[in-house]
């Protein structure tokens, strides 16, 4: 079994150390096959700051203030919350996807599949107005996935078109 120290030594495809979640794992959440994308864990690296950066450093530098103003205690708490409880996945640019947890705004993580395809890396994230992603294609919606289809006997006579 890996120790916490060994987890801390795990690095992303660019050599940046992964951040541990509140349970001591490098996996912050999961994208499953049912979500119409390759199944893999969601991971966050320390990353790089700057406009071409990614990961925790990039989000802290560019979006920490808005995340705190939205009621989160930290960027770390924001990432963990959205990675665990996103309800919609939308198609982004250049092979990225948006994981959204909606309320008055969309709490959003931008993720991309790693080169090896073994994890989803958090590229960026923040709090965005709902119109930001309004026209982006929906890949998965938890509300649609949880709607059971009616059994054959559950159809009303007027709905039976056979």
Show the residue positions of the predicted features:
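Ribonuclease/tRNase effector modules and their secretory precursors
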Residues: 1-162
């Amino acid at each position: 079994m890996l120790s916490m120290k060994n987890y801390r030594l795990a690095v992303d495809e660019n050599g940046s150390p992964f951040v541990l979640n509140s349970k001591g794992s490098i996996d912050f959440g999961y994208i499953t096959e049912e979500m119409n994308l390759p199944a893999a864990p969601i991971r966050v690296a320390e990353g790089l700051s700057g406009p071409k950066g990614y990961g925790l450093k990039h989000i802290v530098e560019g979006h920490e203030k808005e995340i705190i103003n939205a009621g989160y205690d930290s960027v770390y708490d924001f990432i963990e919350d959205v990675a665990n409880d996103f309800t919609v996945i939308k198609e982004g640019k250049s092979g990225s996807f948006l994981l959204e947890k909606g309320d008055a705004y969309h709490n959003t993580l931008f993720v991309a599949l790693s080169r090896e395809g073994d994890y989803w890396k958090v590229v960026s994230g923040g709090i965005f107005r709902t119109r930001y992603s309004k026209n982006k294609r929906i890949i998965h919606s938890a509300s649609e996935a949880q709607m059971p289809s009616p059994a054959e006997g559950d159809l009303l006579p007027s709905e039976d078109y056979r």
